[in-house]
């Protein structure tokens, strides 16, 4: 089957429709991929970049065996279709067993291991997790130190399943690693060990031992899968950083994997190899470099527990590509930018056909330079947790339009619409008109677990379908390509001007010293917001704020979009998948703007703190040293669109 080339191919596939026997579950879908050739390599893993030439490997029959064993283990622990298995894990082979075995037995909840303990506890409680799978104590890892103190805070938790990282160490070093793990446990918990560190009502299990006791031939539970069965909870952050738990069904994930398979065609199937470096708590890693290749009989190479963040992975990436004959990988723009600093010369990377880019818009200069230097074709796409994973992508077999997020995937509708001020549908956008991007189809999730987070989520377009309001702004051209023009919540609104951050970011990326750039709005009493930019320079490069300001002035056509300030920072705040975390930059500017406004009003020594609030978004508190300053503080703070409170610090009275 050829890869998609044009919108006509999308329509042709839709006219044919999905197969009548489309799997009802992800377990069945992987099983069909395994049946193509049970002896073919399915999954390879290396613990360190230095060991990538001698990975651990699973054939498809072994992969299905271990997924089935894991599902049966969870069933024996009391998991059914209505109960939740949560995991807080790095990228390991067992992580895949937990994901797909967990979905076969019940509902899987993916939690970011980089979160702090209290945030993890909140998600576990919200999900009503019955079983938690995480790492056992091991030197150099901090997951257990986050998990152990919060176990007593999760009343629904009945079983703790621990994965010993020492078992992934190869050769003679494994015995030494086991000793190190035991010493770490003793250092943390003394003679009482793990049992003394875990509440008595929570049973403790060793993952490998418990799994090995189960049969891998068939599922023990006589479960009849339905496409509407809930398969997973994935946690997704809003612009304020507040977590939302997205409810996804087997049918959502199966539909998306099937659609993406139609897009790539023979580009992902038997004999093809996919590299996974994004974290397995994120939908991109789980579907684009997990379920999709597994469902089509391709080989997945899982590189280190930290993925792209692993020591030496980026530095040796082209070597890894050559050794494993990688055909496809998925990454975020910051990773492509980092790879530009790694010489390609001397490595044979002719196997590498495509690199998928999502999570954030790809800077034009990075896109051009990467393709010119490596010859690798970048498929820029668009997706979101709420749409399972992929919603649109540039066609592998057709024109890849620089800056576009491509054609919609088969089976999922996608359009730009005009909404009124109340968020109600007015009409569809005409060709190349910017509007709110909406999607509808079998891949679209069921909603958020917390009901009040579903407000304004769905749109009624008077056509009998349910449409998801993505919150992004986009246009559709005459050939069906979509173009993101910004995110409504990220737009910088200066007076009457709506400024797309890309208007500032793209010119900054053209400067030879700039590695990555981000533009945000700084609160301003008079203009509402003023544009400011943050820049991280390339290693060894130099540039001043004045130099960058002069450079971009001739490249930004809209005077209102000229940034009032350019900050050069050592390291840009990033999310766990490498996406620039703009909320952190927004917080910095907000805090600085408010303190400056208070100082200008003669209110000195005030301390401003901020917190996420489920009702107000960002809630501020001003601690004063003088009670006489309260009235003036209310006047100053009232000029900004934030909820706030004040107090007088007793020690400063």
Question: Which residues does each predicted region cover?
Answer:
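AMP-binding/adenylate-forming catalytic core of the ANL superfamily
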Residues: 115-125, 130-137, 322, 329, ...
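Conserved AMP-binding/adenylate-forming
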Residues: 303, 354-358, 362-381, 385-482, ...
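Short beta-strand->loop structural element characteristic of the AMP-binding/adenylate-forming
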Residues: 86-88, 95, 99, 103-138, ...
